[in-house]
């Protein structure tokens, strides 16, 4: 396969938390790109997977050959020699690109780093199917809500002081030690910061290790407080959030370890957060583009009927306590493109991927990209146009997915002013 540009077929997952029927961007993209997909209006459509992960592998649109097999036939040409050497694979992309459409809260979860991922995979391959880490970046394509990382410690201390059932669940002694012992403004890596993290770990550990009966009884009090005394909470959005998530997962530990302990993050379309390995998070509602290191490892904490690995979770977390604003991605102009519209770079502090958003903002014309030193996957999320490299010119509509080989110069040509694409890529340097 010598083509530098070709269309891919992407598979989808129908997890229970996905948006239902044609309200789901995943369903819309799947049906628009594949006429054989008939949307079932009573079924959830949760994730569209784009990449080489064996669970849902992407395939060449015309030949139906798996992308991983095409790469294996020409690793240097399809990945670039630098990426083959760096990521030690001759058939797989180092990233997994997704669209998520979220109706119900996902499990509060964290992902292991590389060392822990390898150890967990050896010890428990059923629950940890990969040996890799899984840092993630989420870019909102509609209004989005999620939990991202632990709240700043002073907010958590105020919550403990205001909410008796939270204090009781944590334990009065541990709660008092936390409120008296935290040092606000501690420099990262300092002894004060290390002490802060240990105090936070004690609070989280006590919540996560409480019995189901104890959690349920405390959750009933918390829900009643949210109904009857919303002013008791230090954030006016919390009571409604607690009531909403309690309807989805009644009396769940997530009401404490999520609603009370994690940042409630709200993003508008185009805004983005980066979620490091070993930081707790959960998506609540909305449609997002997600990119991650190629792994499917999850350590769950709450809002889930699935396996919860409390011991590993409590031990593995970083216990960082940054604000939402500190976790939002800084959007950068992309210097290696030109023409109509613009391209914004989302560049997280990891090696496996970066993402470009190209939007024509009501204009028409062509946007040109210089060749990149690695492979890319592109999805059209809105509007229509064409994608071209050399003599290959392909129609691009919402849900259409493409592979671009290293060093291929590419033009996006808009047919309407809403034409928007996202492009995940990796370069060795």
From Swiss-Prot:
Q: What is its EC number?
A: 5.3.1.8
Comment on bound cofactor: Binds 1 zinc ion per subunit.
Active site residues per record? 300
What cofactors does the UniProt entry give for this protein? Zn(2+)
Chief location bin = cytoplasm
Subcellular location as annotated? Cytoplasm
- List the catalysed reactions: D-mannose 6-phosphate = D-fructose 6-phosphate
Which keywords accompany this UniProt record? Answer: Cytoplasm, Isomerase, Metal-binding, Zinc
Q: State where Zn(2+) binds.
A: 109, 111, 136, 281
Which pathway does the UniProt entry assign to this protein?
Nucleotide-sugar biosynthesis; GDP-alpha-D-mannose biosynthesis; alpha-D-mannose 1-phosphate from D-fructose 6-phosphate: step 1/2
GO MF terms listed in the record are: mannose-6-phosphate isomerase activity; zinc ion binding
Recorded GO CC terms: cytosol
What is known about what this protein does? Involved in the synthesis of the GDP-mannose and dolichol-phosphate-mannose required for a number of critical mannosyl transfer reactions.
Q: What is this protein called?
A: Mannose-6-phosphate isomerase
User: Lineage of this protein's species?
Assistant: Eukaryota, Fungi, Dikarya, Ascomycota, Saccharomycotina
